[in-house]
Amino acid sequence: MKHLHRFFSSDASGGIILIIAAILAMIMANSGATSGWYHDFLETPVQLRVGSLEINKNMLLWINDALMAVFFLLVGLEVKRELMQGSLASLLQAAFPVIAAIGGMIVPALLYLAFNYADPITREGWAIPAATDIAFALGVLALLGSRVPLVLKIFLMALAIIDDLGAIIIIALFYTNDLSMASLGVAAVAIAVLAVLNLCGVRRTGVYILVGVVLWTAVLKSGVHATLAGVIVGFFIPLKEKHGRSPAKRLEHVLHPWVAYLILPLFAFANAGVSLQGVTLDGLTSILPLGIIAGLLIGKPLGISLFCWLALRLKLAHLPEGTTYQQIMVVGILCGIGFTMSIFIASLAFGSVDPELINWAKLGILVGSISSAVIGYSWLRVRLRPSV
């Protein structure tokens, strides 16, 4: 019991559980004895009906769209705190992750196109390496525990949120044909209500969550990635303290253990089970996986580092207080963990053309993401080594 308490008291415990869940999923998905059970679990239908409103999704989509919205709510709360009171409080500091995210999307896409531009079919996957899987990137960072400065974690969060927003916009513009404008209208009204609640000084968290559920449902029905609703709600919940209490900080404290020890491991278990059936190492030499690997492993850190360097040289932004440029470069490597968002974009790009291309894309995504995770973790472990 003592060892268990010590483990859960460690800052690295959440990251360790997430990695174990991901490894377990990979083993189960590729084992003849367990792959059927694993996929049956993910395909289990779960239906929610309130009056004429019906949401009918399988277990995988409920985890990715509903539970992960709670994770993004926590991320939104933490980033807002840093924007208002912490390391991103000045305009020039807040601009830094925005510029970094732009570079982290443009350069990987260009590098992918350098490999695939001549092929009109594989060229459609240009956005695959532009994405970052924020959950796995933070999970790898969490493995380093308390040696990671909080400001570095917040920078990664802010960068990855903007990266995700960029990916959502790319999906909506280039890979989605059936956006529901009526649902987007309902979402806009819900956001307006959240803004009014905030301006009127309403401090009851439950009211924001209730409107947030309406917002989440509208975003889900619109065809846009529903987790966006979590970030939006997080940004509107009041941070300012009154009588020594802050609704945002209180909710952040409540959500943290649920996210670290339940939601993120469940997300990893549901999404890391990529079947490698039909995938061979010989395929690594083809232009599709090579373009993805180059985009994630080289393009991400190169784009983030280059755009950050230009921003500093041109005085368009300042480094977040307490960080170094070298640390930002390593965070850029961790942003090469594209994983679930990259796989999602690959399925949209190639699903209706040639499903076999999705397998080759998965191979590139796995190699690029795992390499980025190992290199980023190892480099940070050396650079953030505690002084003896």
Curated annotation (Swiss-Prot):
The keyword Hydrolase does not apply. One of its GO terms (cellular component) is plasma membrane. It catalyses: Na(+)(in) + 2 H(+)(out) = Na(+)(out) + 2 H(+)(in). GO terms for biological process: regulation of pH. It is found in: Cell inner membrane. It is a multi-pass membrane protein. Keywords: Antiport, Cell inner membrane, Cell membrane, Ion transport, Membrane, Sodium, Sodium transport, Transmembrane, Transmembrane helix, Transport. GO terms for molecular function: sodium:proton antiporter activity. Residues 1-11, 81-96, 131-154, 201-204, 237-253, 311-339, 381-388 are cytoplasmic. It holds the Pfam family Na_H_antiport_1. Its main location: membrane. Residues 32-58, 117-122, 177-180, 223, 273-286, 351-357 are periplasmic. The chain crosses the membrane at residues 12-31, 59-80, 97-116, 123-130, 155-176, 181-200, 205-222, 224-236, 254-272, 287-310, 340-350, 358-380. It comes from the Bacteria. Belongs to the NhaA Na(+)/H(+) (TC 2.A.33) antiporter family. This is Na(+)/H(+) antiporter NhaA.
